[in-house]
Amino acid sequence: TLGTVTNVEGNFTLMAPENSTLVASFIGYTPVEIPLKGKKIVVFKLVPDAQSLEEVVVVGFGTQKKASVVGAVQSIKPAELRVPSSNLSTSFAGRIAGVISMQRTGEPGADGANFWIRGAATFSGTTDPLIFIDGVEVSAGDMNAIPSEAIENFSILKDASATALYGARGANGVILITTRTGKDLEKARINVRIDNTFTAPTRTLKLADAVTAMKLRNEAILTRNPDGTPAFSDDKIQGTLEGRNQYVYPNVDWFDYMFKDYSMNQSANLNVMGGTKKVDYFISASINNDNGMLKKDPNNTFDNNIQNLRYSFQSNVGAWLTSSTKVNVRINSQIVNYNGPSTSMDNLYKYVMEAPSMYFAPVYPNINREDHTIFGNKSGGPIGSGGFSIYRNPYASMVQGSSKQSAYTINTAFELEQKLDFLTKGLNFKALVSFKNWSKTTVNRSFSPYFYELQNPQEQEDGSYLYDYNSISKGRTALETSTSTTGDRLMNLQATLNYQRMFGDKHDVGAMLVYLQREYNLNNPDNNYYNTLPERNQGLAGRVTYAYDGRYLAEFNFGYNGSENFEKGSRYGFFPSLAVGYLISNEKFFEPLTKVISNLKIRASYGLVGNADIGSNRFPYLTKVDLGGAGFVFGDQWQTSSNGATITTYGAEKVTWEIGKKYNVGFDLGLFNKLSLNVDFFREDRKDIFLRRNTIPAESGITGDLRPYGNLGKVRNQGVDMSLDYNHAVSKDFM
């Protein structure tokens, strides 16, 4: 097979045998084949492929034509998600209207962004959106591990009409990701990407040096009391200014001593896709190596810097068993190996901010040939008890141990698609079963630092100093080891019956019914009895759509969901939504304007959403009793106490669903088939938010965690989303 590409004017040159057949193809156009038969010049005329040009948007449990969408749904091209980062969520900021994204840390392994769809509409439980990849619920960590090269479609569902199918669990918005397949390819395609990136802080705080800090401290003391005694002598300040000796007159820049200016990270992705009329496949393998910015201690046998090494694998295989039956098998797995200091990066940064720069050096020379590192410190600091206290040495905290973590994730899904045209045209059935298992093992090893205080410094004739040390905190050279394991399992079951049919030339009717079931378990539950029980959710959802002549659009959605968090009689909630749209640009009277205004659609929606998440407090309607209570005294037997049952939390029998009313009005405007503007005005009124009751008098003895929950809170969340896009192929005729 030979191939070539045209220039910007459409001309091409290709050396080919005389009996060859030339094939010309372009995205959005129907391929054309012309037998060569000895011809020297061949002219191709491609015609638009109406089906390819009809853009499709991924919505809840299916797809819709973009022109028919009446909900607040935004799609983003996978290419726009490609950023020099190992986490997909870091690409959201500034690219998706209505999504608030915040990266709280750049620490490898923890640098995924927190994000909210249209802000936070509740202050109980989670505010995170629901995330689905290929119809399977996943965590934000699973989403972050998906390389952008593996993504086919990426959609954000914002309003009630778009999220109602997910019921209570979609109250905070939904993210839908579809991975790639090879179904449109006859020949295998191999793609390789290798990146090397630099990471550096955008800004660091500039702390005062030792001389400035000492002068300011003395100034503060004398300002309060002119007769007061300065904290630092003139000799101390002058010796530090002149840099006479780094141990006697320390001037430590803890940031520079512990952190590098930048780090280098590597990533690579290899994917293969292809297929035939019977079988299609997509296989992707990725590796990401992210490094921290800590400097290595040459005295340690281990590297205390952070390294987060992640391996990701994605496999999608589909096969047509018959002309109407297809099965899809999808497997996603991740292996994450983390190595870093035993002290968290948050604490290390905090310690650097708090550490004095003038009292002690990070380490002292081992003049007495001790069998351990001589870490600097000074008595009289803020840490300690019983009349003895020292300061924090952040360098000792950084190098005193290491933490190794190994995490394994496996997501598997089996899907069956069955066309039911033999019953009625446009009817099909889909069943999906998925299973996820995640486990994590952590091993921490650390020693206890030996801290010394420099004393009796004596300057010699040659300007050098003699001094000795006083041990102020004895440590331990032997490594102490601790381990922990955690993990969870998630199983989902979905059954979808979908109907889509055009009646005549003007009536486009669609309907869908979905059954959902979910079970979540902890692999290593603690002693809390509730954590040993599986979390189960069940629901029924439906959608009905109607479009008349491609101009008048209507959609009704509902979710009927059950939650174990409420008592019988209150466990199920019904959450409907209604949306309408008017595609003005498809009207006949609008035809003279279509060369300028290529698209104009107005839409509106209203619906209810529910929330049953009360954080970690399960079964709030039950009164929780601890049978291990002690210290009970009865009658005049005040010298004798007894054991017995203790109420830890009073139940709230009437607690029920948190309800939100969502309103959305928007319009889509297209100009010259190049410029598109999408604007949405939204408001959500959330009521019956879960809160502990604070109005119970303390004299009743019901205080703290004893207080029951109630549907008490209210939140109003409103704003505007806007996105502006310009798409045009660059050529000599740019405009």
Predicted regions and their residues:
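Extracellular/periplasmic, surface-exposed regions of secreted and cell-surface proteins
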Residues: 127-128, 262, 316-324, 330-335, ...
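Active-site-proximal polar cores
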Residues: 451
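Short, small/polar-rich motifs associated with maturation and membrane association
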Residues: 1-314, 326-327, 386
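Long amphipathic alpha-helical scaffold regions
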Residues: 348-357, 576-584
